[in-house]
């Protein structure tokens, strides 16, 4: 009986602490706030959700940005709108121009980046922007 009660309490605590909580934008780490203000000058922060290891930010233009808990971005999704090249200024303009498409999502990968383009193509690069692969 005590074992069942203990397991139920553990399960309840896990469910309780695993949920995202809504926090004010001021709770974002400074580097996350700077990233947003530098790259999305006309957009405002509409919603910030925090969980145990990340922040999920939604801007008023629909853009979604995921940050790790330290404030470093891990994914930027423009929701089918072109992302600003200022996110990765040495890489993004080169990819957009060479493939004649707009970048609508960018994610950090282990050794580089994954870009999703407006023509549904996915491009994988190393940290310097050298294309490693692509897929539809």
Identify the residue ranges that each predicted region occupies.
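Long, terminal "pre-/pro-" and other extracytoplasmic accessory regions
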Residues: 2-6, 17-136
